[in-house]
Amino acid sequence: YAKYLNQNGWSLDLVSHSEERSKKAREFFQNNNKNNYYHFDLSKKDSILELLDKIDCPDLVVANAGITMMSKAGESSSLQRDELYYLLCGGVIDLIEGLVPRLKEKDASRIVIISSIGAVTPMPKSSLYASAKSGIYSYGRSIGEELANENISVTISLPGYVKTNAHRRAGLDHLERKIPFWMWVSAEKVVKMTEKASIAGKSTVIPGLAYKLVKPFLGMEITSKAWKMLNKRN
């Protein structure tokens, strides 16, 4: 998303927990000297509060936590659950809640929340991830209705399988072999479709033609069984 916005002339406030990724971002965007870079662990409340103190009020907020977690029910630790939930849901809420009073002072502004298709369909062995994404999806839809009269648009994107290295980092590299090619969506397509929907003032968007076609069947038992079969390790 940052690459797309940079190409379109935006000045960016970029936040990353990884020093290596932050360094790569600085090198990639070296021609844009208006960008700001922050190194925070967004799974911690103190980091969100410190970030809110440092940044100016943006015209566009993109909440995109690029992490996933595979965990069978009953096998995660309390710390894992707390950190994942705050990163994917609670921290996003705290960030947006902290910015909304300032956003209301602008003539117009936008909020984009990257949720997941897992927010609206069962994800066996990824229940923590899916439930956190479901929570932020519900929050986004609710504040979207509330803030519409404040000239603040809220768009929630529900991507499916996106071609990034997030699955590998989470130990889910088997998905690259199991999931049919037509179910994968490029990160570039997700960003372009999400940004188009946001500019148009749409509340939700499901990037990718395949996911649009199966949208009426999401949440049904047959869809859940197919999802479980595709995600199963050999």
Where are these regions (language model features)?
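Conserved NAD(P)H cofactor-binding loop of Rossmann-fold oxidoreductase domains
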Residues: 64-69
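Substrate-binding pocket helix/loop in short-chain dehydrogenase/reductase
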Residues: 72-85
